[in-house]
Amino acid sequence: MATNLRGVMAALLTPFDQQQALDKASLRRLVQFNIQQGIDGLYVGGSTGEAFVQSLSEREQVLEIVAEEAKGQIKLIAHVGCVSTAESQQLAASAKRYGFDAVSAVTPFYYPFSFEEHCDHYRAIIDSADGLPMVVYNIPALSGVKLTLDQINTLVTLPGVGALKQTSGDLYQMEQIRREHPDLVLYNGYDEIFASGLLAGADGGIGSTYNIMGWRYQGIVKALKEGDIQTAQKLQTECNKVIDLLIKTGVFRGLKTVLHYMDVVSVPLCRKPFGPVDEKYLPELKALAQQLMQERG
């Protein structure tokens, strides 16, 4: 049931080695690190996971390893979106086979597909997922697909759709979606507005920075449930100070560097054409890693 998918879900990074190959050992450590820090689930193979610079077989390997390592301890959502419907269907079938709890797909991008073509794309993936709920992934800043509110309302009511990952800064639209669909599982996508997203109606979030400080986001959820707005705001501010630094360094490579200093990821590199972190930021990232490890205890 999609209702079981509510919570704080880390958008999992994909570690690579010096030769740009998948680093399976680091991936396993990262899964365990997230489990140990109290994350509710993992969103695997999305933007943060650098899915679009991986081959289809690599993406399937990542799904298999994560499913094997998580062993039913947390919820697992497989992002299977590709421009190609057939490739998306192949990944969806793999997610079902590996025991994932849901699939997700970004709107098909690059080509100017019609909205009906978008709907057909999702219907085909849902069919291949064989009963797994679909999490529609709306991220207009990266996909270039700017869905209207009416189009979002149509997509989330397709048979088989159980959730929406709303990676948009439009909190008014977030509230409108919640008002229209009170039972929809709704994820906030931008980490820097997590608390605001919850207040606008989100059930939880899917975010990249949860990989290094997921307990802070769980703290925001707890504070808001208790009506403690001041604590929620304080925690969001602390998260945003980290995000300010990561925006300067490049978010994915910055996160991997922090995780490297935490002894979770062996090599802090993203796949090319992404480059490495500028060395001038390394002292700040190392200090951040030490701070977070002390805070976590």
Swiss-Prot record:
CDD domains: NAL
Protein location: Cytoplasm
Annotated coiled-coil segments of the chain: none
The UniProt record lists the keyword RNA-binding: no
Active site: 137 (proton donor), 165 (schiff-base intermediate with substrate)
InterPro entries: Aldolase_TIM, DapA-like, NanA, Schiff_base-form_aldolases_AS, Schiff_base-form_aldolases_CS
Pathway: Amino-sugar metabolism; N-acetylneuraminate degradation; D-fructose 6-phosphate from N-acetylneuraminate: step 1/5
Stretch forming the signal peptide: none
Organism superkingdom: Bacteria
Keyword Lyase attributed: yes
A GO term from the CC aspect: cytosol
Gene Ontology biological process terms from the UniProt entry: carbohydrate metabolic process; N-acetylneuraminate catabolic process
Quaternary structure annotation from Swiss-Prot or TrEMBL: Homotetramer.
Protein function: Catalyzes the reversible aldol cleavage of N-acetylneuraminic acid (sialic acid; Neu5Ac) to form pyruvate and N-acetylmannosamine (ManNAc) via a Schiff base intermediate.
Protein family membership: Belongs to the DapA family. NanA subfamily.
Protein name as annotated: N-acetylneuraminate lyase
Species of provenance: Escherichia coli (strain SE11)
Annotated gene: nanA
